[in-house]
Amino acid sequence: MMKPKRLLSLLLRLIAVGATLAAVIIMATSHEKGTFFAVSYEAKYTDTPAFKYFVIANAIVTVYGFLVLFHPPGSPLWRLVLALDLVFTMLLISSISAALAVAQVGKNGNSRAGWLPVCGQVTKYCNQVTGALVAGLIALITYIILLLHSIYTFLNPLLEKA
């Protein structure tokens, strides 16, 4: 039988891997052809560097999360895992921030810069991007909870000795 703390950690890691994998799949499959004033164009995630960064960052975090699932519980390398959890949480924060900024401009445009919103013409694409961002945010929140749980688990024995 697993200890409750280990079970919680495993459950959070499974949720995080699922959410990052979903974010990658949803964003990587987002594309739609649209027409604007008789001009045809195709909206793809690869057209936007921030969306490419989002996919790459989430893919890296997915692989990391999957590998950590098989890490033995009693290993002394858990300190390294704790540090890497922090690094990958920051990677998720930066990629989601960049993608959210671009998505906001795509949805609302920017009147001062003369950028028109595109979501009215490519709604399926925008909905997929929104879904990927929601999955990414779920992964981020899960990683933050996991990080706090790991820090507490790591520091608790030290605090009890003091």
Curated annotation (Swiss-Prot):
Topological domain ranges for the Extracellular compartment = 28-49, 101-130
For the Cytoplasmic compartment, the record's topological domain ranges are: 1-6, 71-79, 152-162
Regions crossing the membrane? 7-27, 50-70, 80-100, 131-151
Q: How does it sit in the membrane?
A: Multi-pass membrane protein
The UniProt keyword set, sorted, is: Cell membrane, Membrane, Transmembrane, Transmembrane helix
Q: Does the keyword Transferase apply?
A: no
Stored InterPro entries: CASP/CASPL, CASP_dom, CASPL
Q: Where in the cell is it found?
A: Cell membrane
Q: What is its main location?
A: membrane
GO CC terms, sorted: plasma membrane
- Tell me the PANTHER family matching this sequence: CASP-LIKE PROTEIN 1U1
Protein family membership? Belongs to the Casparian strip membrane proteins (CASP) family.
> What quaternary arrangement does the UniProt entry report?
Homodimer and heterodimers.
**Record protein name field:** CASP-like protein 1C2
Q: Which organism is it from?
A: Populus trichocarpa (Western balsam poplar)
Q: What is the lineage of its organism?
A: Eukaryota, Viridiplantae, Streptophyta, Embryophyta, Tracheophyta
